[in-house]
Amino acid sequence: MTQTSKSVAEAFERASYPIPGHGPRDIQVLKEALDAYDGGLSSDKYGEGAIIEPFQERMARMLGKPAAVFFPSGTMAQQIALRIWCDAAGSKKVAYHPLSHLELHEKDGVRELHHLEPILIGDRSRPVVLADLQQLEEDVACVLLELPQREIGGQLPAYEELVKMSAYCREKGIRLHLDGARLFECLPHYGKTAAEICELFDSVYVSFYKGIGGVAGAILAGDLELTEPSTIWKRRHGGDLISLYPYILSAEYYMDRRLPLMDRYRREAQELAALYNECHAVSTTPIVPPTNMFHVRVNMPKERLEPIIVAVVEETGFGFTSYLREEKDGGCMFEVSIGDRYAELPKDQLREAFRALDRRLNPSAGRQL
């Protein structure tokens, strides 16, 4: 890590009012959750017991699937889902977006561990649509769709497009898997329940540490054709730990607390994105976020932007981001995810912080937000 990137992170750490997220990812996250439960509660053991089984049943009902299996990580859960669907079809080919988590962040796990052959579909700048599936020149066992698409700012396809893609895959005998790491965050936009969205898919993965803000863990849901072999693969991957209750209880605790707030987070993200879009040389992707997340892009090189952000943090106390990522065209970007923090921010001071940011980005303008 360079010295300049440290300065942004350090400024964010010193900020009186960090803007994104729920709060620090410290051990208080787990402690708060565990304090809500009776300390005499028996723990789960190797995938069985009074904690894990009721939670899996609850998630299966919530997602509208016959069964669900708790995993320590989504990386494990999704690779296993794709492997099972490929084995069932007698094919090694799967299709997903070029900016899928499997392609960018898993060290080629589907290739190296499972010897699958990913086919990248769609444009890097937008979600997958029906036309992308229709243009596939090879037969595939499974298509993976991510809702929302994190690496392009949380963009979502239209619900009608999802319905068309689901119908197309079923007609062609292709399994459709949902990377729903942030599924709950997109439900207010669609105006649908989790079960209504998941009905379009053969299998679904959901994360418990992103918008929900738990410690870690994931659920994989589908019919028994998927879930029964997934427990075997979970053991093969080393994921069948003697106990997973710290993950499960924190998932349950924060899910109950934050699922009712997802629409609020979305509206707050839209409010914040509007403030960013009023600033000189700044734009968000999407312009109007459909979920609680978006990307901020600044048309300025990192060596110029970084001291500006640090100065505004020190002047106003508001922390915008803990990092900047340089883009190939010379600009910078960072991701924003709205959580519990935003509602507690003093909004008049927040607007003044954005005025200060705008002034420093464009000293000659001096316009008002």
Predicted segment positions?
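Short glycine-enriched loops at secondary-structure junctions
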Residues: H97-L102, R236-H237, E326
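Conserved C-terminal alpha-helix-loop-beta "cap" of PLP-dependent enzymes
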Residues: T2-Q3, A281-L369
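Hydrophobic beta-strand scaffold residues
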Residues: E117-P118, L176-L178, F320
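Active-site phosphate-binding strand-loop segment of PLP-dependent enzymes
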Residues: R126-G180
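Active-site C-terminal subdomain of aminotransferase-like
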Residues: E151, L156, E199-H280, T284-T291, ...
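Conserved N-terminal alpha-helix of the aminotransferase class I/II PLP-enzyme fold
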Residues: S5, P18-S73, D87, P98-E103, ...
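PLP-dependent aminotransferase-like
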Residues: C86-A141
